[in-house]
Amino acid sequence: MIAFLDSNALIYYFEGAQGFRQAVVDVLQSIKASDARAQVAVSRLGVMECRVKPLRENNRALLAQYDNFFNQVQIVELSATIVTHATDIRATTHLKTPDALQAACALSLGPACSFVTGDEGFARVKGLQILQVNVVMR
């Protein structure tokens, strides 16, 4: 199994309040419980989205946390095939371009991929297996 993390799930984990962070941890723990060999993937777009705020705020500690994480997971590059698929997704679901790209990246990993997100809009994407991050503030 591959857990593809949407940018919002990563930002919840690294920057969110405890309730947000715990929601992501809960989803990841359930993945590991069902498949101890599960892998984690993110898109190159997700890398960019997560690094913007720490760079803008000159938060080197947070940037280092993100970069350390990204060095340990699979990065899905934005190929021409993925962009074409994202275009089709955007046309049929009305998702915003970055979300369509994220969905296409996850779908490119095959049927063993689950998309971890806090955004319910991805439910409109045909074939995308979603693991919803349910945020409960603690």
Task: Give the location of each predicted region.
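Short, well-structured N-terminal submotif of metal-dependent ribonuclease cores
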Residues: 1-41, 54-65, 136-138
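Acidic, PIN/NYN-like endoribonuclease modules and their adjacent C-terminal/linker elements
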Residues: 2, 72, 103-138
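A generic structural signal for short hydrophobic patches within well-formed alpha-helices
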Residues: 10, 47, 122-123
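Short, flexible helix/strand-to-coil boundary loops that buttress conserved ligand/catalytic motifs
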Residues: 14, 54, 90, 126-129
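General small-molecule cofactor/ligand-binding pocket signal
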Residues: 41, 76, 131
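Mobile, glycine- and charge-enriched loop segments
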Residues: 57-58, 66-87, 134-138
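Active-site neighborhoods of divalent-metal-dependent phosphate/nucleic-acid chemistry enzymes
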Residues: 74-118
